[in-house]
Amino acid sequence: MASTPWISFTTDYGLADGFVAACHGVLARLAPTARVIDVTHLVPPGDVRRGAAVLAQTVPYLPAAVHVAVVDPGVGTARRAIALTAGNGLLVGPDNGLLLDAATALGGVDAAVELTNPDWLGARMSATFHGRDVFAPVAARLALGAPLADAGPAVEPGALVRLPTPLVQPETDGFTAEVLTVDHFGNVQLAATGALLESLPRSLRVAHRPAVHARTFDDAPPGGLLVHVDSAGLVAVAVNGGRAADLLAVTPGDQLRVTAG
């Protein structure tokens, strides 16, 4: 890592409690020269898919770093704690699919280990707070240049847990795609890439509602439904001045059909 290392930090811990601060404290004590970028701590509780999407869509724009992510409904169970290298980054977190989309965005998994070395872990080991006691201590050591192999035994990249592939179904007059995420503004991001939208006309229908094929929000009238390619290169459905998720009554995992109108 760089002489002044970077660590990014993504969780579902929220900001009402001291969980984030405790992890920051561990990082500061063990790696006082590291700079920490808080990606978000407002991932919906236990929503691994949302955490994976946020992380994967953010890491390409961060400096070379150790990326710590904790959305871990299986904490304390037999699920593995892992660290892996991918491109110019390292990722640390639970083996529940959270890290692998980000690893792909960085160029793919080069090597992975299970975090079992007790010398790398916190002196106090809580069964329910591995962010503080496992992932933060490991991230700090990696940020300071400790070898990944010293953290624990190697894991075959193909044996890592992966999230199910979201549905994307091209059709003659459009496509059906799974809702990947809903952001703070109520915009509905689909798993479909922007290429599926290119050949469709300006007049569209989304779940039988009229919409426009747009480049910006203002291409639709106020309150109008629009479909565009978002900043991650994926198809998104939005409302100019409103919340598409509320209008369409959809949540992540639902399916939406986008067709020529």
Curated annotation (Swiss-Prot):
The keyword Ligase does not apply. Optimum pH is 8. It catalyses: (R)-S-adenosyl-L-methionine + H2O = adenosine + L-methionine + H(+). The record marks D72, R79, H130 as: Important for activity. InterPro entries: SAM_HAT_C (IPR046470), SAM_HAT_N (IPR046469), SAM_OH_AdoTrfase (IPR002747), SAM_OH_AdoTrfase_C_sf (IPR023227), SAM_OH_AdoTrfase_N_sf (IPR023228). The keyword Ribosomal protein does not apply. Keywords: Hydrolase, S-adenosyl-L-methionine. Changing H130A: 75% decrease in catalytic efficiency. GO terms for molecular function: hydrolase activity. This is (R)-S-adenosyl-L-methionine hydrolase.
